[in-house]
């Protein structure tokens, strides 16, 4: 059996080897994770990465010595400073070293997610809701529900829950009454797994909430931003690569509309045929609408100008209109 110092030396060599070989480090929470889960995760990570556990004090010393070495890179120094500042090497955590994309690793971890009952003293990792419906329990069991303020009624000789009731929120500690009731209802509400808390990716630290941002989400936000900028530029009349085609098309529609309204023909861009098609109603899309609007506006102008003449006729009668 190797001595303690020899075991530490071998562990340090393995840890340093992982830091050299892999560019990504996943810091994972191991609370309530069973040894069999760890074994299964390690098995499925073969060829993808390595899961390393151990004492945090030893891991800190290894990272510190690596950063203080004369041959230490800026990457090694930054990793050490980040581990100390963000307290990454604390608590019940494990490290997964990999060069694979993060979703590949999280898919392996999610595969070994285990359902578990709510035990007394456990911290709820999620909200727990007892659903409405018949429980199949005898009326004498109503005391369990009353202790948790769950509305019930007796239906066909059994206890029936009137409406859904939240009995635990995230972070709550499971008490004896809640654990007993959930056990009687055969509800195992908790799920435990190796859970990624943060990722060190070649000099950058990503927190848990950042991991939900995928390439598809980034593309969606980027397209929305481009669309908003294009709409703003178009409304302000500022030519950009995105708005210039629309501005040219709008100007051409206006020109064609003016051609239809004033009987002016232009040879460029097949203007004569387009004008003829607009007059015959064979021109589709916004161009026809613009031409029709211009034609309607031109026809309405003489009618508007004729209105004062009717008022002049009334004025000719003078007082005679009273008789």
From Swiss-Prot:
> How does it get modified post-translation?
Phosphorylated.
Gene Ontology CC, one term: cytosolic large ribosomal subunit
UniProt-listed SUPFAM superfamilies: Ribosomal protein L10-like
Alphabetical UniProt keywords: Phosphoprotein, Ribonucleoprotein, Ribosomal protein
Question: Where does this protein have compositionally biased stretches of type Acidic residues?
Answer: 307-317
Name the segments for region: Disordered: 298-323
Q: Which GO molecular function annotation, any one, does this entry have? A: structural constituent of ribosome
Give the domain of life: Eukaryota
Which Pfam families does the record associate with it? Ribosomal_60s, Ribosomal_L10, RL10P_insert
> What processes in GO biological process is this protein linked to?
cytoplasmic translation; ribosomal large subunit assembly
Function of this protein?
Ribosomal protein P0 is the functional equivalent of E.coli protein L10.
Q: So what family is this one in?
A: Belongs to the universal ribosomal protein uL10 family.
Quaternary structure annotation from Swiss-Prot or TrEMBL: P0 forms a pentameric complex by interaction with dimers of P1 and P2.
PANTHER family in the record, alphabetically?
Answer: 60S ACIDIC RIBOSOMAL PROTEIN P0, LARGE RIBOSOMAL SUBUNIT PROTEIN UL10
Name of the protein in question: Large ribosomal subunit protein uL10
Species annotation = Trypanosoma cruzi
